[in-house]
Regions:
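C-terminal motif of bacterial Sec signal peptides marking the signal peptidase cleavage site
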Residues: 15-19
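N-terminal "mature head" segments of proteins
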Residues: 20-127, 145-155, 370-375
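A short beta-strand motif characteristic of beta-propeller blades
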Residues: 47-58, 95-101, 144-152, 191-198, ...
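Repeated scaffold domains used in trafficking and secretory/extracellular systems
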Residues: 57-69, 104-114, 154-166, 199-210, ...
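Residue position within the beta-strands of beta-propeller blades
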Residues: 72-75, 118-121, 170-173, 214-218, ...
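Structural motif
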Residues: 80-87, 125-136, 177-184, 221-228, ...
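Short loop/turn segments that connect beta-strands within beta-propeller blades
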Residues: 90-94, 138-143, 185-190, 230-234, ...
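Blade-level signature of beta-propeller repeat domains, shared across WD40, Kelch, NHL, RCC1
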Residues: 340-378
Length: 378
């Protein structure tokens, strides 16, 4: 018994001495923290491969594009006869069909829903000569045309927008330099309804969301204010009034974020970016993003990513616009398309980006030439 006890004590002594001589485990260092929101994130390359549907080079590229999982619909100009052409491309087969436009082209008046695309236009009545506003529906596969509605047009609608869902065709009409009317054509009662009127020196933008259609209005009738308005019930769901020296110029939003760009009236290039968390209502400090984006570029959101462009210097000293995205609240920035971006548009529904890239070889008549490229956002 004593012998067994001695052996146990000896074993414990050995273990104790070993423990005393053992070096303490090196603690695992914490991962490098993300930069604070007021520090500029480093721009890293995360280039997206391009899918070119359709592979068409346009001179004076027109409106659109509109696209979904099955089709891409675009508008381009045929310089040989000064005609405007619709292009409808089947994304599964790559087949492209085209048809010449009837009526007057109105900027941004093209919308795609299901297997049909809709076009808002103005043309003269063949019998009376009076101007009429028409909403036309085209089958994407056959390009068969149907007139949805026709009504007298006593105003000039140089710019418009069009949003389509199961119940409504919603569009914006320009009544004067600062007066706009948002109307909705109900597919149920087959009538047009005035949804709201507003005064603004900046054209209001329609935003199609999963829960309905919204208007982004940047108004100045009673001082500069940026508003997000739900058209179904004419409710202002968010509003921000700017200082008298600041002008709101771009506004993007989704379920999580609101991003507003303001410009200085004294210096349009001295813009600032403001970001709000929609869940908490808190405005974030994003001073580090100042100067990262091209001042007049569009803003789009997909999830927590903000898409815009920035100026990049070429080897010869010239500059081009490259497409970038910033992870909100401003902790990461990625260069995702390094071409010379003329315009771009993001579709949150499909998570894709349409880019108009300035074409390398100018056309013979020296008009601006662009190529449409469709990119995956993820």
């Amino acid at each position: 018994m004593k012998k067994t006890l001695c052996l146990l004590l000896a074993a414990l002594l050995v273990l104790s001495l070993a423990a005393c001589g053992k070096q303490p485990a090196t603690p695992t260092p914490d991962p490098t923290p993300d930069p604070a929101p007021n520090e500029a994130p480093k721009l890293v390359e995360a280039l997206i491969p391009a899918e070119e549907y359709p592979d068409i080079v346009w001179e004076n590229a027109g409106g659109g594009p509109c696209w979904n999982e099955n089709y891409i619909v675009t508008v381009g100009n045929d310089s040989s006869n000064s005609k405007t052409i619709f292009y409808s491309t089947n994304r599964q087969t790559g087949e492209t069909r085209s048809t010449e436009l009837d009526g007057l082209w109105i900027s941004d008046s093209l919308a795609l829903y299901g297997d049909s695309f809709y076009w808002l236009t103005i043309e003269a009545n063949k019998e009376t000569g009076e101007r009429e506003l028409l909403l036309l529906k085209y089958d994407c596969a056959t390009l068969e045309k149907t007139t949805v509605f026709t009504e007298p047009c006593e105003y000039w609608a140089e710019n418009s927008q069009l949003a389509i869902d199961d119940e409504w065709a919603i569009y914006v009409l320009t009544l004067s330099d600062s007066e706009y009317e948002i109307r909705g054509y109900s597919f149920a009662d087959e009538k047009n309804h005035t949804l709201m009127k507003l005064e603004s020196s900046i054209f209001p933008r329609l935003v199609q969301m999963t829960d309905g259609c919204y208007s982004v209005a940047l108004q100045e009738s009673d001082g500069w204010a940026a508003r997000i308005i739900r058209l179904a019930d004419d409710e202002t769901v968010w509003e921000n009034r700017s200082e008298s020296t600041r002008v709101p110029t771009r506004l993007a939003f989704n379920e999580s974020w609101i991003v507003l760009r303001e410009e200085s009236q004294a210096d349009p290039n001295a813009g600032s970016l403001r970001v709000w968390n929609r869940t908490t209502g808190e405005e974030l400090n994003v001073d580090g993003l100042k100067g990262m984006l091209y001042p007049s570029s569009e803003l789009y959101l997909i999830g927590d990513w903000l898409y815009s462009t920035r100026l990049v210097t070429n080897e010869d000293g010239s500059q081009r616009q490259a497409l970038i995205r910033i992870h909100l609240p401003g902790d990461q920035a990625e260069l995702i398309y390094d071409g010379d971006v003329f315009r771009f548009r993001v579709d949150p529904m499909t998570g894709e980006i349409a880019v108009w890239q300035t074409y390398d070889e100018p056309s013979q008549n020296h008009s601006t030439t662009h190529k449409l490229i469709l990119l995956k956002a993820s």
